[in-house]
Amino acid sequence: MSSFITTAVVREALASIVREMRRAMVRSSYSSIIYEGYDFSCVLIDAKGQLVAQSGEDHPFHIIPVAASVTRLLAMHSDIGPDDIFLHNDPYTGGTHLNDVAVVWPVFVANELAYFIVIRSHWADIGGMTPGSLSGGAREILHEGLRLDNIRVPKSGASDTLRLIFDNIRVSDEATADFHAVLGICRVAEERLRRLIDKYSFEVLNQSVAELLDHSERRMRASLRDLPDGEYAYVSYLDGNDPSLFPLQVAVKLTIRDDTAHADFTGTSGQIPAPLNAGPAIAPTSVLTILKSYLDPAGSITSGTLRPITVHAPERTILHACAPAPCGGLNEVRFAADAAVLGAIAQIIPERVTGDVRGTSNHTYIGGFDPQRNKDFIFYEYPSGGTGGWATHDGNSAVRAFNEGENVSIQSTEVVEAIYPLRILQNELRPDSGGAGKHRGGSGLVRKVEVACPEARLSVLSDRNIIPPSGVNGGRSGAPNCFEVLRDGKPIPVSAFPGKVTSFPLRRGDVVVMQSSGGGGFGPAAERDLSLIVDDFADGLVSAPSLAAYGARESAGIVERGMTDLSDEASASIEWRNDDAPAHECGVSAALAQRLGLTHGSSIELAMLKGPSLRAWVDRIEAGNAATVHLSPNLRRFFAGSTVTVRSLGSQRPALTAGTHR
């Protein structure tokens, strides 16, 4: 048995190997999405397929599914050899989306399979229907590129299989260069691992790893034991797109029993022929990410962390998709799953949670031919937004959130203009984007990119363009994401559905405008300190009209408290429906509809002073002169009183048609 000190040293040594891998990736990769965007992750996996080491900087949705990828590999291949490596990106068997390709490098000790070194990185293109492979228009996974389900290739990197892969993707020179960089990094990581084995012995190293996994398990069990037993349900929503007709939902029931947690996603929308699906590894990733972040943020993540947690996501839902469902927007689904689990634990520990984050990756691709450099190009960016406000501080602005690892906010202007036929015209924080609250949500950003080549194509895969990130404990929602193209200074239509653009033709001089959402607010905005409101106004983060949300106003440049009448908020009496309508459908009285400007299909928010806000869509308007809202009995558990604050979210539900998704 290894000693406590030896185990601690081994833990840090393994993490050091992974950190060195990360630094080498940044220094040696060819594509800017790696060396500027940090869209990659590195981990060490043991021979049983268990995650044993990561750097603390890696992306959760990269590293947690890796264990599932390797478990699949072990089931598929019983003849793994020391000269083999494997490529994996298949979302149905532990992958994320097709662009995220994992290189799995086995390590043998005395002819025994000992460990796997894994680097999962985003390839700029993996084939498919559009430059960059990701788009809002995919209807099946074949539209998104090549599926690689643990494809065996030699460690030398020379094979007809690899040639076939690189011959069928765009900008293959970037992918080839990055791939060979990964091979070199894995070789060095194997050398570092062998030195560690030589120093402590293979037996002691395995004993230390076993103790590390057990320690992670004990930490998570202790955190869960502090929570009251019970069942806590919540539903989060995605915008959806044309095939889904109206918002998709991720429903979760989180059951806490002693030192265990079980998340049941029954009630989640069925998979759809659109890129808003995720494979089976994503639901456990969301549950672990939220529980770890809010209950035990210290300490490393290993497969031991997941042992007290069980997850059920029904097959053929957007959280457990099967072929041929496209999964390019798996991160949009993951953000919704994160929000659902966050809404569940906000009912348990409302004082410790935050408002929601921007809720999407905002995949943005501009691709075409660069005549000046005489080659094809693909510019890929995912503009970050605001994070949620919390008990003691405002959210952060234009940064990656806690559930995104070390990925950077945006690529630098200098690098973009040096290697692409593009000009960056504007980078700034987006006014009025952070959700109002006692502690405001962080601001999103505004980024304008001008096309400087004769023609190009734009694809966008985003969410939360209709349904904004929610606040908590009475805090308000952040502004939704927004994408548009300016031609001759005027906006032009680029898609039938917000945030879903497929290969839209751009001309020289067109300007792509990306506006990312802000985070949700924490606590009632009327409780915000006036000095903070003054600072926000002076900094341009809150405009004069938006001061009303804080119970403030501006006069002659002076911000002061004052009586304000909010046009988007009203107190309403609750009446309970006696039909079988789902929880997200509600009725409102004619008086409330007139007060808030609601019509059939309008979306509303039910603000809870303690815990998460709820979302609903108006399916009928009742006669009545009093402000009332007619809710499903399924929501009774959220309400102790007979009134609720109702806010208009300003968005319309595309359709309420019999037989459509609910």
Tell where the protein language model's regions lie, with residue ranges.
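Generic structural signal for buried aliphatic residues
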Residues: 86, 114, 506, 512, ...
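Glycine- and charge-enriched low-complexity intrinsically disordered segments
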Residues: 541-559, 634-653
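Glycine/proline-enriched, intrinsically flexible loops and inter-domain linkers
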Residues: 1-82, 90-109, 113-567
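Glycine-centered tight beta-turn/hairpin loop motif at sheet-sheet or coil-to-beta transitions
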Residues: 111, 609-611
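Short beta-strand-centered segments at strand-helix junctions
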Residues: 572-607, 615-649, 658-662
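Short, surface-exposed secondary-structure boundary micro-motifs
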Residues: 91, 517, 609, 649-651
